[in-house]
Each structure stands twice: as structure tokens, then as C-alpha cells.
Amino acid sequence: MNITIVSVGKLKEKYLKQGIDEYKKRLNAYAKVSIIEVADEKAPETMSEAEMKEVKRKEGERILSSIAPDAFVITLEIEGKMLGSEQLAKKLDELATYGKSKVVFVIGGSLGISQDVQRRSDLALSFSKMTFPHQLMRLVLIEQVYRSFRINRGEPYHK
């Protein structure tokens, strides 16, 4: 399976990079993993609704241009469906079973994701009703993907 994480903005925090690199290395035993960073749109501190929509639209175009047409797209959204680790593992297993070898996870920028990206999404996934920094979500997401593969192979993992 090919797992791609598309995320808005550059990861600057060294400790997050180290954690992500560790899980990416571990995941190589199960899947091909790539991380694509698309540029975030520079935005003023205070914006009108129209300006916010435009920022999301521009970031959305960059996100969409990095997604293969045949990929199964999972967007991370506060209002998405909440799944437990076992349920996410089952979903990834089902995708592999039904021939969906390309799975793309999308993490939007600080304003979220555009409606165009939401329309392209096959599954809107929520990790919590809380808001997290999108850089931190990369680490949380890649750990959960790793955990999913361990679960699907009957290997031990922390509950």
C-alpha cells in the first residue's frame, strides 16, 4: 500500500520531525510512505470571511494538485467521523482488500481545508472535537497509521 500524507506548511519543530521520521521508518516494513508539504498561504492576523475563504481555496488547489486521481482520500476534519484505532485499522485493511493501493491523508492549514478538498474526500476523519496544531497532527496521524498496520497483522501494540 502507498500511504501519502499531504500537509499544509513546513514542519519546523525538530522534535516533531524526529518523531515523524521514526514512525515513517517503522512503517517502511508495511507500506511505502511519503509526506508532501504544500506551501501555506501567507495571511494577515485578522481576515474577513472572504479572505479566509480565498486562503483556503489557494491552499486547496495545492493540495488537490498533489493527489493522484485514483487515490482514496481521507481528510482530517474536526467535524469528520471519529474512529477508534481498531476501526481505522479495519478501514485501511478494507481499502487494501478492495484494491485501493493509494491512500492519501490530508491535513489542512490553520484555517482548515477548502470545500473543493472536502468534495474530493472519500472519508472525513476526526481525531477529536479539539483543535490541534496541524504540525502535531502529522505525528499523531503517522503513529495511528503505524498502529493500524500492527493491529492488522496481529502484532502487539499498546492499548
Swiss-Prot record:
Q: Which reaction does it catalyse?
A: pseudouridine(1915) in 23S rRNA + S-adenosyl-L-methionine = N(3)-methylpseudouridine(1915) in 23S rRNA + S-adenosyl-L-homocysteine + H(+)
Protein function: Specifically methylates the pseudouridine at position 1915 (m3Psi1915) in 23S rRNA.
Under Enzyme Commission nomenclature, its number is 2.1.1.177
| Entry keyword set | Cytoplasm, Methyltransferase, rRNA processing, S-adenosyl-L-methionine, Transferase
Put simply, this protein is called: Ribosomal RNA large subunit methyltransferase H
So where does S-adenosyl-L-methionine get bound?
Answer: L76, G108, F127, S128, K129, M130, T131, F132
Query: What's this protein's family per the entry?
Result: Belongs to the RNA methyltransferase RlmH family.
HAMAP family reported in the protein's UniProt record: 23SrRNA_methyltr_H (MF_00658)
Q: What class of enzyme is it?
A: transferase
**Record organism:** Oceanobacillus iheyensis (strain DSM 14371 / CIP 107618 / JCM 11309 / KCTC 3954 / HTE831)
Q: Where in the cell is it found?
A: Cytoplasm
Q: Which CDD domains match?
A: RlmH-like
Describe its partners and assembly state. Answer: Homodimer.
Q: What is its main location?
A: cytoplasm
**Example GO molecular function:** rRNA (pseudouridine-N3-)-methyltransferase activity
Under the heading Pfam families, the entry gives: SPOUT_MTase
Instruction: Quote a single Gene Ontology cellular component term.
Output: cytoplasm
What Gene3D superfamilies does UniProt report for this protein, alphabetically? 3.40.1280.10
